[in-house]
A protein has these predicted regions:
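Boundary at the C-terminal end of the N-terminal hydrophobic targeting segment
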Residues: 21-23
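Bacterial N-terminal signal peptides
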Residues: 7-18
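A cross-taxonomic marker for long C-terminal extensions/tails that follow the last structured domain
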Residues: 87-158
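Positively charged n-region of N-terminal signal peptides that target proteins for export
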Residues: 1-5
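Histidine-anchored nucleotide/phosphate-binding helix
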Residues: 53-68
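Acidic helix-start/capping segments at beta-turn-to-alpha-helix junctions
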Residues: 72-86
Length: 158
């Protein structure tokens, strides 16, 4: 039991420190006089349920960014184990993640990408994801493409 409690404390502390780090990056962008060309949130983890935990905070940060810069383009790129939460077959077990992503894409004009290469390693194809999730050939290349056009990268990892 003691080992389990220490593990929970460590994981919680790690998530909190990650949240603080990316929140300060968001605050730094908000403090600027001019908006960047866009913002891309990178999520990569080996935690299958991480999207359900992170997306509410990411959505709140997107709202903060857009309160300051209303037309700011935003993208989310997921390319770890967490991306499989967004497969159609996991919709019933990952309702919060699916609902948030669908809202972000359809109502908030946010592009959400998952990695086709990573999916392919596990026998998951583009057709296994719902229409509101874009399956990009390679997530690192997608992120590089965003950065090449001036997007600010905010990395969210476990």
């Amino acid at each position: 039991m003691r080992y389990s409690l220490l593990t929970v404390v460590f994981i919680t502390a790690s998530l909190l420190s990650s949240t603080v780090a990316w929140s300060s990056e968001v605050d730094n962008i908000i403090a600027r006089k001019e908006a960047p060309a866009g913002v891309v949130f990178e999520i990569v983890s080996d935690e299958a349920d991480l999207l359900g935990e992170l997306l509410p905070s990411v959505k709140a940060d997107i709202q903060k960014l857009r309160a300051r810069f209303p037309d700011l383009p935003v993208a989310i790129v997921s390319h770890g184990t967490e991306q499989f939460a967004l497969t159609s077959k996991n919709r019933s077990s990952e309702i919060q993640a699916h609902d948030l992503v669908k809202t972000l894409v359809q109502s908030e004009d946010v592009d959400v990408h998952v990695c086709g290469t990573h999916a392919g390693w596990y026998g998951v194809s583009q057709e296994d994801f719902p229409d509101y999730v874009d399956v990009t050939a390679a997530a690192p290349t997608q992120i590089d493409d965003y950065e090449a056009i001036g997007y600010e990268l905010i990395v969210l990892t476990d």
